[in-house]
């Protein structure tokens, strides 16, 4: 295992725990401000749009000044966004908090670049797959922490997420290794041309996958409430189940599957699972499923 890998992994996992605290409760929280289902969708979209616009800039900045400072900046932005969301008294401040969080949400992509800096080429799929298991940890611990902290009031989970991001930023300053060194940018330029067909196809697949998962995040708590009468705790339990599956697949099975079938063999099966996930909510008609 490359030196510094587990520090990077822990930083990402803690960041995603904060994300997991917020996601299951955000829709219901927004309804307290009079938000409709459509407005909740726009709220999630505002985070994603800010991330879409700013993540490439953060990636380029990490090439110039290093991975570590950009990850720290992202974590500080996440803390600020979480505190603003928790302190919001009106809907526009809720949007402002999510936009701040999204604009600074480049920690995962920069962390993946840091792992690519550290890892030998043959080990990159396995190590980046293990980094993906941090999503699972976030969705296991985050909803549980969010559900418990919500007992103190609807604003409390966002403050908890903000405190966690602040602690994570301080720990990153102290512990996170710098993996990007002078000359690396020039050395790696041209490995894949920006307009290459391979990169375009990967970008399209990635966009569709992230869009599907974001739609699930944005709508599930409202869908579960209105169709099955799920409480916030019940919705959090579903996200916890998603997290457990992510930990098993990304943390253990992914490396073996890629070794046996290759990335091109694993991608279609993953897409098929997403399709089943999207279709399955239409099947049950009661709380029993």
Where would I find each of the regions flagged by the language model?
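Helix-loop-helix hairpin linking two adjacent transmembrane segments in secondary transporters
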Residues: 131-173
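Helix-to-loop junctions at the C-terminal end of transmembrane segments
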Residues: 55-65, 249-263
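Short amphipathic helix-loop junctions that connect adjacent transmembrane helices
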Residues: 25-37, 219-234
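C-terminal transmembrane helical hairpin of 12-TM major facilitator-type secondary transporters
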Residues: 265-289
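Helix-breaking motifs and short loop linkers at transmembrane-helix boundaries and internal kinks
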Residues: 34, 66, 87-92, 283-285
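Juxtamembrane intracellular "pre-TM" segments in multi-pass secondary transporters
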Residues: 1, 177-205
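Cytoplasmic helix-loop-helix junction between adjacent transmembrane helices
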Residues: 97-136
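Conserved MFS/SLC helix-loop-helix module at the cytosolic interface between two early adjacent transmembrane helices
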Residues: 52-89
